[in-house]
Design a protein with these regions (language model features):
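C-terminal catalytic lobe of FAD-dependent flavoproteins
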Residues: 293-369
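Helical element adjacent to the flavin cofactor pocket in flavoenzyme catalytic cores
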Residues: 138-193, 197-200, 205
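Beta1/beta-strand and adjacent pyrophosphate-binding region of the FAD-binding site
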Residues: 3-15
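Glycine-rich FAD pyrophosphate-binding loop
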Residues: 26-45
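Helix-loop-beta segment of a Rossmann-like dinucleotide-binding subdomain
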Residues: 57-58, 86-96, 119-162, 260-266, ...
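Central helical "cap/lid" subdomain
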Residues: 189-241, 272-273, 289
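Active-site lid/adjacent beta-loop-alpha segment flanking the redox-cofactor pocket in flavoenzymes
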Residues: 45, 233-319
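Dinucleotide-binding Rossmann-like beta1-alpha1 core, especially the glycine-rich loop
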Residues: 50-128, 134, 282
């Protein structure tokens, strides 16, 4: 087994949450290792990157969690960009949510935070929007990060420059527990060899695959299919967030179109005709002109979902094993605050009252009652 010290951290999972947590520890002089089976399959590489606390219609503790994280993100991204030398595409571009009638608008959980848009206003904000949309809400403070092309690469580089050790192709077969304390993991490497890697403390952040590592974690995959189209630069300046489809414009005119919600897909890979057709119908319903723009890519991924669609963050009942998973649709939005709270928790640093309340609300124990 490999040697370890009290300032060593083992991260199980190399997706966005794992990288975010690894980054904050490495930046504070910890020796960090990341175990990842296939990092490019993580949700962080396939998500649209929206920062949509208000436009998602989040409620209660999820809304507060999103608000807190959105406040942290500018400084967090600034540090990542400085350490990596890679610009991450953070844009407070605003998000428009369209409605067909006022009844639906008034039922929207966060409508009081948005600016009301008449149909004329909608057409001004979203050039070419379908005339079926009569009203809208503009959430000007919501925005996006270009996670797929920039943020993930920037985090990987920043982690590497801070000494993080990556073990790609490392599939965790089992956790090694002694006297209810984690001391390591049994890992099948890319060449088929079974090794034991020990640790002082570990953080499990394996997204949709978390249950395969620790069965008591009730996380399941919800597949999402996406595609991108190339529009004219600056044609779409706001994100357009419809009821079943969203259009996320990057600064070069590329538009991310998402996403299907396939609850019974398990880990079935690949795009399907039905999935692509659903996305195309969504484009047509929101921005008909975009149906004539060239399609660039299509891909899929697996959101880590819990029974109540809220993340699991905090201590496990195994000493020195911490959990950060189940972020479902909001991994990009929640990454900054998750990494911050986990760092404080692992270090026994003081937490604010609202951080303590988040840990209570998002504890694994809520599923054991």
């Amino acid at each position: 087994m490999t040697e370890h010290t009290k300032n060593s951290i083992l991260i199980i999972g190399g997706g966005l949450i794992g990288l975010s947590i690894a980054y904050v520890f490495a930046r504070n002089d910890f020796k960090v290792s990341i175990l990842s089976k296939k990092r490019n399959e993580s949700a962080g590489f396939v998500a649209a990157g929206m920062l949509a606390t208000h436009a998602e219609g989040l409620e209660d503790e999820l809304f507060k969690f999103g608000q807190q994280s959105q406040r942290l993100i500018p400084e967090w991204i600034k540090n990542i960009e400085q350490d990596s030398g890679i610009e991450c595409g953070l844009r407070e571009c605003g998000i428009v949510v369209p409605f067909k009638n006022m009844k639906d608008l008034r039922k929207f959980p966060t409508y009081k935070y948005g600016k009301y848009l008449s149909q004329k206003d909608l057409q001004t904000e979203i050039n070419g929007i379908n005339s079926i949309w009569k009203h809208g809400l503009l959430f000007a403070e919501d925005g996006q990060i270009d996670n797929r092309r920039r943020l993930m690469r920037a985090l990987e580089r920043a982690c590497s420059l801070h000494g993080v050790k990556f073990q790609e192709g490392a599939e965790v077969q089992d956790l090694i527990i002694e006297r209810n304390k984690i001391i390591g993991a049994k890992v099948l490497n890319a060449t088929g060899e079974l090794n034991e890697i020990n640790c002082f403390k570990a953080i499990l952040c394996s997204g949709a695959w978390s249950k395969k590592i620790l069965n008591k974690i009730p996380v399941s995959p919800i597949k999402g299919q996406m595609l991108s189209i190339q529009g004219p630069a600056n044609f779409l300046k706001r994100i357009l967030f419809g009821p079943n489809t969203y259009l996320v414009p990057r600064d070069d005119g590329l538009i991310i179109v998402g996403a299907t919600v396939e609850k019974d897909s398990k880990f079935n890979q690949g795009n399907t005709p039905n999935g692509i057709n659903q996305l195309q119908n969504g484009i047509r319903s929101l921005l008909p002109e975009a149906m004539n723009w060239p399609q660039m890519e299509h891909w899929w991924g697996f959101r880590p979902s819990t029974p109540d669609f809220k993340p699991i963050i905090g201590k496990s009942d195994i000493k020195n094993l911490f959990i950060a998973t189940g972020h479902y649709r909001n991994g990009v939005l929640f990454s900054a605050i998750t990494s911050d709270i986990i760092y404080k928790l692992v270090q026994d640093k003081s937490l604010t009252d609202i951080e303590i309340s988040f840990l209570e609300k998002f504890s694994l124990k809520r599923f054991e009652m």
